[in-house]
Amino acid sequence: MEVTGTPSSYSNRNCTIENFKKEFYPIIYLIIFFWGALGNGFSIYVFLQTCKKSTSVNVFMLNLATSDFLFISTLPFRADYYFRGSNWIFGDLACRVMSYSLYVNMYTSIYFLTVLSVVRFLATVHPFRMFHVTSVRSAWILCGIIWVFIMASSALLLVNGQEEKDNIISCLELSPQKFKSLLIMNHIAVAVGFLLPFLTLTVCYLLIIRILLKAEIPESGPRAAHRKALTTIVIAMITFLLCFLPYHALRTLHLVTWDKDSCGDVLHKATVITLTMAAANSCFNPFLYYFAGENFKARLRAIFSKVHL
């Protein structure tokens, strides 16, 4: 069940949202699928090539890329559903997995980006005091906790399966009967899944800026590490502002103002667009790996040099 879903009662009125979704979703999802699969698939390959020299940063990035790749694999099914005019043909179990995979990816991405930024900040500012926190072992444990927490928190989405009416099987649609529970889930998700991580990122950003503006630090060594930490945090914040903030804001507004007897086409279409923006974060994360990864560029060059030999 998703807030961009369309209640069945809409089909009885002159609402244009269904046509919009049929035209918009398939092409955008397939574009995200192509670039996301290419970028994250190759990134995973690079990370696995360097597993013997892994760092905590690489561990977080590998988990982030894995989360993105798993989600991206569901996008062709979503594209097919909307291309058929919101008619699901892949069975009840696959339907339940669709919404579940979307929100598991969204919030694991948010938490991996946040923890990655915090760990990089701590490793830069307090490298020896926080060594146990920034170790590879601690990174794997923390990633495991994030996976379990997000997957367990999203488990309620597995309750909602496909529904058949007039020989049309719907999936990913908003159910008026479960609207109140969905509204409560949204408020909790916004607070814990978005606002808390975003505030954490903002604090890290302000602190690292403050450190960089302090007494002069040599260009090599500490200052270079500070800049890499700042790059990580800035890319994470850009992802939050472009991908996650619009969706959470419009999703909440859409739910708060939702009326089952009204089309609400303009707001509904805007929410549809922001959902694809949230999904597109999977395409942007490879830029984080390239510009802020631990020796990612060097390892990338090593792979290409082997290919040319």
From Swiss-Prot:
What cystine pairs are annotated? C95-C171
Coiled coil segments of this chain = none
Q: Which UniProt keywords apply?
A: Cell membrane, Disulfide bond, G-protein coupled receptor, Glycoprotein, Membrane, Receptor, Transducer, Transmembrane, Transmembrane helix
List the GO terms this entry assigns under cellular component, sorted alphabetically. Answer: membrane; plasma membrane
Q: What GO molecular function terms would the record report?
A: cysteinyl leukotriene receptor activity
Extract the Pfam families matched here: 7tm_1
Residues on the Extracellular side?
1-26, 78-98, 160-187, 251-271
Record localization: Cell membrane
Cite the ranges annotated as topological domain Cytoplasmic: 48-56, 120-138, 209-229, 293-309
Family statement = Belongs to the G-protein coupled receptor 1 family.
| Role, per record | Receptor for cysteinyl leukotrienes. The response is mediated via a G-protein that activates a phosphatidylinositol-calcium second messenger system. The rank order of affinities for the leukotrienes is LTC4 = LTD4 >> LTE4.
For this entry, the protein name equals Cysteinyl leukotriene receptor 2
Q: Which organism is it from?
A: Mus musculus
